[in-house]
UniProtKB/Swiss-Prot annotation:
The gene is lysS. GO terms for cellular component: cytosol. It comes from Lactococcus lactis subsp. cremoris (strain MG1363). GO terms for molecular function: ATP binding; catalytic activity, acting on a protein; lysine-tRNA ligase activity; magnesium ion binding; transferase activity; tRNA binding. One of its GO terms (biological process) is lysyl-tRNA aminoacylation. This is Lysine--tRNA ligase. PANTHER family: LYSINE--TRNA LIGASE, CHLOROPLASTIC_MITOCHONDRIAL (PTHR42918:SF15), LYSYL-TRNA SYNTHETASE (PTHR42918).
Amino acid sequence: MAEIEELNDQMKVRREKMENLRDAGIDPFGHKFTRTHNSQELHEAYDEKTKEELHELALSGIVAGRLMTKRGKGKVGFAHLQDREGQIQLYVRKDEVGEENYEIFKKADLGDFLGVEGEIMKTDMGELSIKAKKLTFLSKALRPLPEKFHGLTDTETRYRKRYLDLISNKESFNRFVTRSKIISEIRRYMDGRGYLEVETPVLNNEAGGASARPFYTHHNSLDIDMALRIATELHLKRLIVGGMEKVYELGRVFRNEGMDMTHNPEFTTMESYEAYADFEDIMDLTEGIFQHVAKTVVGQDVLEYDGKEINVGGKFKRVHMVDAIKEVAGVDFWPEMTFEEATALAKEHDIHVEKHFTSVGHIINEFFEKYVEETLIQPTFVFGHPKEISPLAKMNEKDPRFTDRFELFINGKEYANAFSELNDPIDQLERFEAQAKAKELGDDEATGVDYDYVEALEHGMPPTGGLGIGIDRLVMLFTGTTSIRDVLLFPTMK
């Protein structure tokens, strides 16, 4: 309770100062202010100059930012202004700025925004500074900065009030700047390879393109139930049918499922589709995206992540799912076997057989998830997923039990999912119907039948390679972050 009273006392004092500014004819919530430099530009241009060189140059600058430190007494004061790029020191003398400007400085609290015009100089201690000539009040902060702005330690507050985290935690601020750069570079990479960025609906009559539980809503005007998209896949492939040939979309998708260190119900994906390509071409594309981000954003191929060194340079390992299971668990699924034989194997290995499992393929996937996933530390393409768990992927020509699909695993987690797209409308309808049956048997992640998409395929879709990358996990990898909430500006909270 004492903390609340103290906070209220501070807020009252700040409001009094706001009124004092108004009484003095100063607007506490200013207007447009034009800067000549940000803090980084000043440091890059003048950090190497000596005090004497700067004095001789007699340069002036105009800066603006949030007041983060303030000290001094009498007729001289020092402060630091913080902008997006960093901080710059202010040197304020009453005899230089005049009575009115010095009053502005005295009345300013930490957290307030000031604009400052003055001489670019260095102090006797060698710190680059602006020797103020004129101060402009830009915005009064009516609440104090948290915990003396040394960084929020309460993680829930950091997530709920991200703006405070960004003010007080430079590491967090830089992480989100890196996120923006990563997304920009992915766009640059895709655009440079002739892909068109497109936008597809977030609200759909049927949620498809992935195995996940959707969020539902109701469209009042049309009086129909709709689902938020769980993937962008089916609309993007309609564009391939329409002749766009190479498309991608960066956007939010929504899955009404559990939350943990690597899952948030609202997250960002990049999906791409390329006509006349197959899943092996898309492996090369995926490698290229990761390596382009490594080169342009972080400047290195070897990443420190979760106590491990992850090398994203060179060719990623490629292994068939069945071979991976055989290597790790010693169980061989290459020979043909009945569902009953596979079920017996599952029970021997303490693998639960769900009611909606109807084929050996489901059992193979369970073995992979139990035994193999967590062992895949370095970037690894696992391909050859069973047909039953890959309703949108093309069957492998040599062994139709499996599909031309891959997932990219790093540090035991999936980072990308891709395949040679199924373009046979009759086969696609049969797989949709099998999914619908699984849904009836209790598989709440199974999809229904999207007849409109099947109709689109009936008009002809060329052989196509498709890719989906989880952007949030990718950002986690490249920023060394183990919680997805630390790479989402506003994560979902209860």
